[in-house]
Regions:
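Conserved beta-strand positions in the central sheet of alpha/beta enzyme cores
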Residues: 92-94, 149, 172, 196, ...
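Short beta-strand elements of ligand-binding domains
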Residues: 122-123, 173-175
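Conserved, mostly hydrophobic/aromatic
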Residues: 5, 37, 50, 93, ...
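Metal- or metallocofactor-binding catalytic centers and their adjacent structured scaffolds
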Residues: 1-49
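Metal-dependent enolase-superfamily TIM-barrel catalytic cores that perform enediolate-based chemistry
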Residues: 54-167
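Flexible, glycine/charged-enriched surface loops at secondary-structure junctions
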Residues: 15-20, 53-56, 147-151, 225-226
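Generic secondary-structure signature for well-ordered alpha-helical cores
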Residues: 7-14, 29, 113-116, 142, ...
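Shared catalytic-loop signature of beta/alpha-barrel
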Residues: 5, 144, 155-170, 177-247
Length: 247
């Protein structure tokens, strides 16, 4: 990927956002590589202006809430992991679900009992069977979950739209809206309530564009990390301070 992109990027000015974007968008897929390059070039441009990236991005607020991801595992292990994060000040937990939905529900119940003041939401990673999704969302709503991320497979477009129309729990779009093009489709179909932006794959340029699109349609938004280093997570976190990031 770099071998292809390097000669096409060399010679462009760091502030030539249209030129850089054209080069990166002409290279299909490879979202992680393009996101990293886009962010690095924004960083280079900021420093060429004598500023840091956070100054160029002009944060709209000074505090954001963080969420801690609880993986799929034994209940006691997950609870111990949650205790560690809760002790560090975390009050929002993202609970991975999908391998054993009955066990997932029991784990959510134990978490709610152990941390009644914490907010929980589930990330199903497209794992719920369409015919069972409503039943699980109703059960999770009773347990006090805030919302559910990607409950159904992305290709189940009609089922996703129908589930969102039922209004059981707010739905988060992640893999269904990986690019601005994807997001426009999902907005037209009205399949979600909250957009999960991943700067690791959308860089700064596409993250800002997608955030603006979501805001225009009255959608909420959050910023998530994805297999990043601490430095990458820091750069992603900078975008969480943008206007329109509500969750």
């Amino acid at each position: 990927g770099l071998e292809y992109l390097r000669p096409r990027l060399l010679g462009l000015e760091a502030d030539d956002q249209e030129g850089i974007r054209a080069v990166l968008e002409a290279f299909p897929f490879n979202f992680g590589l393009k996101g990293a390059l886009d962010t690095a070039l924004w960083e280079a441009w900021a420093r060429s202006e004598g500023e840091e990236l956070y100054q160029v991005l002009k944060p709209a607020k000074h505090r954001v809430r963080v969420a801690y991801i609880l993986g799929l595992g034994e209940e006691d292990e997950v609870l111990e992991d949650a205790r560690m994060a809760f002790g560090a000040g975390v009050r929002v937990f993202k609970v991975k679900v999908g391998r054993d939905l009955e066990a997932d529900t029991r784990r959510i119940l134990r978490l709610k009992e152990a941390f009644p003041e914490a907010e929980l939401y589930a990330d199903a990673n497209e794992s719920l069977p369409p015919k069972e999704a409503e039943r699980y969302l109703l059960a999770w709503k009773e347990l006090g979950l805030r919302y559910v991320e990607e409950p159904l497979p992305v290709e189940e477009v009609e089922a996703r739209r129908a589930l969102r129309e039922k209004g059981i729990l707010p739905l988060i779009a992640d893999d269904a809206a990986m690019t601005p093009k994807d997001l426009r489709r999902e907005l037209a179909l009205n399949t979600f309530d909250v957009l999960n932006l991943k700067p690791a794959r959308t860089g700064v340029t596409w993250t800002l564009e997608m955030l603006a699109l979501a805001r225009e349609r009255g959608k909420k938004a959050m910023v998530g990390s994805q297999a990043q280093s601490a430095f990458g997570a820091y750069q992603s976190a900078l975008l969480a301070f943008q206007q329109g990031v509500t969750e």
